[in-house]
């Protein structure tokens, strides 16, 4: 459940997100295991940057980690910069008192000096207070003040790789199961072959299918899949 600090931001978090529901491709096994160790408390005060060059699921992953961490009676917050960038950087003040801070898409703060300084100060505070700090974005797109770039590059950098094409069907089935929706293999293959082949798009399409199916009180057939893909 979201903590009061999360609610105060008026930024929603997907409360169904969990590492138990995150499809782990073979190339991401090491990354996910390191992140799970954080949840187990075996690496107190870790500072990690998740480098994601595409739509490989980093936003869901950060929300899943926040939820799982909070469910273990720890405090956490998820801050997506796509929404927070329009807020005052002062929202970062005091968050180092929490056990875990996840900030998504930090490369969006490029050329915004007040945000760059606020994030630099937060990194220092988290180091002193040994709170967990997870940042995500594209390390190659980061163009900020030198001190901030230097600090981030000293973090443990984990790469979130794209799912292989031969894993897409398995991933789609796993997501469908977690959403409690039923789609035939034939229709699932149609969905994959007619969508952008990344896990973010697949998840968004399946989530919309779940919503439409519930609202219309009908099963998910080919016509509904075509409609959702066309409107996405």
Which ranges hold each PLM region?
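Short conserved motifs of the RecA-like P-loop NTPase core
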Residues: 182-194
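The conserved phosphate-sensing helix
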Residues: 195-209
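Short regulatory helix/loop adjacent to the ATP-binding pocket of P-loop NTPases
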Residues: 140-154
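Conserved P-loop NTPase "ATPase switch" module shared by AAA+ and STAND
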Residues: 94-116, 122, 129-138
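A short, basic N-terminal segment
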Residues: 1-37, 214-232
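Conserved AAA+ ATPase "SRH/arginine-finger" region at the nucleotide-binding site
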Residues: 139-140, 155-167
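Walker A/P-loop nucleotide-binding motif
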Residues: 43-62
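Short glycine-rich substrate-engagement loop in P-loop NTPases that contacts/grips substrate
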Residues: 66-100, 110-113
């Amino acid at each position: 459940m979201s903590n009061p600090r999360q609610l105060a931001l008026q930024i929603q978090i997907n409360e169904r997100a969990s590492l138990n529901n995150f499809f782990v491709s073979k190339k991401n096994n090491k990354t996910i295991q390191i992140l799970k160790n954080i949840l187990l408390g075996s690496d107190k005060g870790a500072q990690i940057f998740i480098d994601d060059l595409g739509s490989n699921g980093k936003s869901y992953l950060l929300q899943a980690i926040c939820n799982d961490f909070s469910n273990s009676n720890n405090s956490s917050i998820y801050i997506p910069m796509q929404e927070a960038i329009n807020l005052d950087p002062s929202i970062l003040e005091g968050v180092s008192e929490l056990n875990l801070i996840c900030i998504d898409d930090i490369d969006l703060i490029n050329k915004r000096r007040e945000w760059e300084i606020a994030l630099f100060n937060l990194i220092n505070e988290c180091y002193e207070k040994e709170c967990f700090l997870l940042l995500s974005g594209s390390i190659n797109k980061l163009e900020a003040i030198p001190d901030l770039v230097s600090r981030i590059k000293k973090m443990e950098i984990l790469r979130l790789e794209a799912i292989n094409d031969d894993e897409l069907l398995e991933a789609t089935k796993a997501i469908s199961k977690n959403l409690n929706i039923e789609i035939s293999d034939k229709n699932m293959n149609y969905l994959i072959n007619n969508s952008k082949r990344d896990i973010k798009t697949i998840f968004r399409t399946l989530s919309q299918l779940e919503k439409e199916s519930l609202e219309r009180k009908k099963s998910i057939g080919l016509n509904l899949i075509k409609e959702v893909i066309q409107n996405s």
